[in-house]
Amino acid sequence: ISLIGLIIAPTNTLTAEQEAFQQKIEENQKIAEETKSQTNQTNEAIDTTDTTETSGEIPENIATLMTRYQLTEEQVRQGQQLELTAFGDSVMLGATSNLQEVFPSVVVDAVIGRQLYNSLKEIKQLKKEGLLKKNVLLGLGSNGLATEAQFDDLMTEIGDRQVYLINTRVPTQRWQNEVNALFDQMATKYENITLINWYQASDGQPDWFREDQVHPSEQGLIEYTGLIARNVLLP
């Protein structure tokens, strides 16, 4: 789903909802670029040694993430240390700051309008730069179809890394079910793919989406990120 028209539209033609979304996207584009800086990969995690073992209390910073994203203490601590590359389209781009909360070392490469079928070059570049980590989160499919062969090419480049594949919810577009069927098939085909069923989790939850029914609202971003984290991190 292309947001280019929204991004370049004059401010006075946007609704309050659209203007807020545009600002969110622009902020997350900056954050995503910053995640690619190797100097940013080391110092942003919560201090997981900040425990109060004598009283048995969970530190406030850990407890906040537990509540917000419905995670266990152990999952939050794992997330602070996990190496993860998140590669996707504007749906993932919108979640950049949320992902960074749970996974401070995450590398986010997400752009508006990205298609799976032309993502191979970008994956190769991330790999060349040492930014394709051992865990790869794929958030593609919102903008159109791809073939099994194109998906295979992507997986060949990714190699034996653990892949977390998020399926899609685009009820206004004819390709939604075909994309999700392909992803189901690929999750069965590849042992190193874990399917994250955003389509199922978000069913019947209109408040989780902005007015376009595709991009998550603020609440939806929390639900989206929490679902990812609960699938990526051991319980």
Task: Indicate residue ranges for each PLM-predicted region.
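N-terminal secretory targeting modules
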Residues: 1-83, 230, 235
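Conserved SGNH/GDSL esterase-like catalytic core that processes O-acyl groups on lipids
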Residues: 74-150, 170-177
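Solvent-exposed, polar/charged alpha-helical surfaces in well-ordered, non-transmembrane soluble domains
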Residues: 85, 93, 97, 101, ...
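Hydrophobic/aromatic beta-strand patches that form the interior of the parallel beta-sheet core
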Residues: 85, 164, 194-196
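Conserved beta-strand segments of alpha/beta enzyme cores
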Residues: 105-107, 162, 192-194
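Structural signal for conserved beta-strand scaffold positions within catalytic alpha/beta enzyme cores
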Residues: 108-110, 165, 197
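Active-site segments of SGNH/GDSL-like serine hydrolases
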Residues: 154-180, 202
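Catalytic His-Asp segment of secreted/periplasmic serine-dependent ester chemistry enzymes
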Residues: 180-235
